[in-house]
Amino acid sequence: MSDDAVADLPAASQDADDTLDDEALDLSAPGAGQAIEPIIVEIPEALHGERLDKALAKLLPDYSRSRLQQWIDAGAVRVGGAAVRPRAAVCGGDRIEVVPQRADDENAFVAEPVDLDVVYEDDTLLVINKPAGLVVHPAAGNWSGTVLNGLLHRYPQAAGLPRAGIVHRLDKETSGLMVVARTLPAQTDLVRQLQARTVKRTYLALVWGETPEAGTIDAPIGRDPRDRTRMAIIETASGKPARTHFKTLDVVDLGRAQVSLVQCQLETGRTHQIRVHFESEGHPLLGDPVYTRNFRRGRPQTIKAPLPAPFARQALHAVRLGLVHPASGQSVHWHAGVPDDLAELMDALEMDPDVDLV
């Protein structure tokens, strides 16, 4: 992970390369989760008959007229307790209440009731089982309804922590276990564990083709220069070291194609690491809408076939998490069985959703 992503953590942890994905935002601004106080203004006689938006632009010069118009349209500006249109004329003596609305990126700091599946909780840390479809922290296109917003709602004091205590993430459509710090010392400790690569993160993935019995994919990952929305194997200096260890637990034959169930152990935590690594080996994940190439130079193309059950996301689940508890110093671990959608697909493939990990 980039140093910029952890610049708001204590100095001892700023060299961590495994805390947040490379494009993570700094979500530790002070005042996170605080309510916005309304602004009350009275229209002077000199502005009698003026349009509401123009009058407010003169009385509240810190805000642009376009932003004020947006607030009026949103019903956040009231005259005498009633919402009005921007073109409405004001009268001298009118009492105007303006409730400033946060810009999209500011919603990153708003507490919202988001359903979090809590697997474990104490005064030091929290472990959640994130469902597919839930975004971890706000970013373009997903400014609200994230894990971070839910943390601020559940724990108001999390507003004082960098990123509300988040130290690592899962992709939106990846399900499974995440650990979140509840104190700054715990967050610092967890970042150091990630830096030392002692946090054990185990995933289950369904991939196309027959994978080797076991192996390690050691290939650097960086932003794809041909498509900046993708990550890719980058052999130049801009690629960051990435290692994924895997074991094949099961292989099924669909007639025209094969599907492998693999257990993955992350040594590093690059953006989209498992998805990129297995695509690079010619074994893209089932359901992955982005990393879909099914061939590797010098190897035959992996054949794909219709699945026996519909599946609308990448088949990836963070099934096991292990670390040293920041307060007790004891080794602890958690397990989260595969969610219903993945279990149904595995049943249809005649694989055991309760497969034993190795």
Curated annotation (Swiss-Prot):
One of its GO terms (cellular component) is cytoplasm. PROSITE patterns: PSI_RLU (PS01129), S4 (PS50889). Its EC number is 5.4.99.23. Keywords: Cytoplasm, Isomerase, RNA-binding, rRNA processing. It is found in: Cytoplasm. The keyword Transferase does not apply. Residues 50-114 form the S4 RNA-binding domain. Gene3D superfamilies: Pseudouridine synthase, RNA-binding S4 domain. It holds the Pfam family PseudoU_synth_2. GO terms for molecular function: 23S rRNA pseudouridine(1911/1915/1917) synthase activity; RNA binding. Transmembrane segments: none annotated. The active site is at D171. InterPro entries: PsdUridine_synth_cat_dom_sf, PsdUridine_synth_RluA-like_CS, PsdUridine_synth_RluC/D, PsdUridine_synth_RsuA/RluA, RluA_PseudoU_synthase, S4_RNA-bd, S4_RNA-bd_sf. Its main location: cytoplasm. CDD domains: PseudoU_synth_RluA_like, S4. One of its GO terms (biological process) is enzyme-directed rRNA pseudouridine synthesis. It catalyses: uridine(1911/1915/1917) in 23S rRNA = pseudouridine(1911/1915/1917) in 23S rRNA. Belongs to the pseudouridine synthase RluA family. PANTHER family: MITOCHONDRIAL RNA PSEUDOURIDINE SYNTHASE (PTHR21600), RIBOSOMAL LARGE SUBUNIT PSEUDOURIDINE SYNTHASE D (PTHR21600:SF44). NCBIfam families: rluA_subfam. Responsible for synthesis of pseudouridine from uracil at positions 1911, 1915 and 1917 in 23S ribosomal RNA. This is Ribosomal large subunit pseudouridine synthase D.
